[in-house]
Every structure is written in C-alpha cells, then in structure tokens.
C-alpha cells in the first residue's frame, strides 16, 4: 500500500455535493476529503452514484449544489488540467492507430513534447502496438490505451470508470500492477469498479456508496454492515 501521509492538504474535497437529473438525485449531499498519492476503490451497486461522483469531480457534470475542490482549487479550468478521466466505454477511435489516437488527444491538450508521448506509451506497455488500428486491439489493450490517453497530459489525479470491464483476469491483473506503479509514482487514483477483489492489497481505501451517498470508508475489502 501507499506510504503517503494524510498530513498534506487533501487532493480532492467534495462538500455537500448534490447532483440531480430531473427529479432523480444521483448524489445526495456527499461530503468527503481524499488525500493525495493514494488509490481509492469506489464501490457500490448500480445506481449508487459512483460514476456520477467521478464525472462531477472531473467537471463533466455540473453539481446541482455543493462544491468540488481539487488540489485546493475550485476553478474549472485548473481542475480539468489536473485530472485525467478514463470513461466507460473507452473514448477511442477504432479506425485510427494507437499513436494516432494519442496524437489526436495530445493536440487537444496542446502537447508538442515527443518525450511525453514516449513516456506515456512506455508506462502502459504498448510500445509494440502503436501502429496497429485500435479496432484490432484486444479489450485489455484498449483499456491500457484508454489509460494512456487519460495520462497523456501528466495529470496529478486519475479518475477511472470500470477499467477492468470485459477484460480477462490476466489483463486485469496487468492493469492493477500498472496502476499501483502509477500510484507509487505519486498520482492519486480513483477507480469505480464492480470487481473489487482485484484491488484487494492494492487499494489504500475502499469507499462504499449507496443511494447517492458515501456510507463507509474501509481499509480492507470487508463490506460495512450497511452493505454486507
């Protein structure tokens, strides 16, 4: 597990966060602080509010009420610059090669430094596959390419929605290993997943959600009584 201390200012703070879609409240007054340099697993049933929380922290959903503070900032542009978001399903172009996908997103971020591309690709282990069309990738390779896209602008915080979805166990464990290394290099990582057992021994904290609220935070995978 990460050895990062909790004495520095939290990386992410949400205060009384509410998000409504029409009459449905997807988030119901969520307040929490998350330290930097840690890996958090966000768990709960479908409809618990996991992805909505992730998207709201990322700035993709505007909160109905409440505040999101990332690295002490509430400025939307500053927050977006510090966050890498991996969507589910992945936002990749099948007809383009892996490198073409990265360069497309790199242009959006204004990345011109070639070493940034090289380092990102090396970090996810996709060097030999860059010239192949993404449509020919296995699901595990697609997920690693999605992770590369999220990491390309060197954000301090990664928000990953179902990164282990539809991949075989070997690919999933490879992804977990990558994420642990990335966390150990100082990134803060939030992972929404229904495959919590993959993160046992890797996650610093398990965050349990139900009905749009965080109901418990545990150091181990044993669920709290409310969701047992």
List where the protein language model places each region.
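H-loop/switch region of ABC-family ATPase nucleotide-binding domains
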Residues: 192-194
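Helix-to-loop junction immediately C-terminal to a conserved catalytic motif
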Residues: 58
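The feature captures the beta-strand-to-loop junction immediately N-terminal to the Walker
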Residues: 43-45
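Conserved ABC ATPase "signature" region
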Residues: 103, 114-129
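Catalytic Walker B motif of ABC-type/P-loop ATPase nucleotide-binding domains
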Residues: 158-161
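Conserved ABC transporter NBD signature motif
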Residues: 66-79
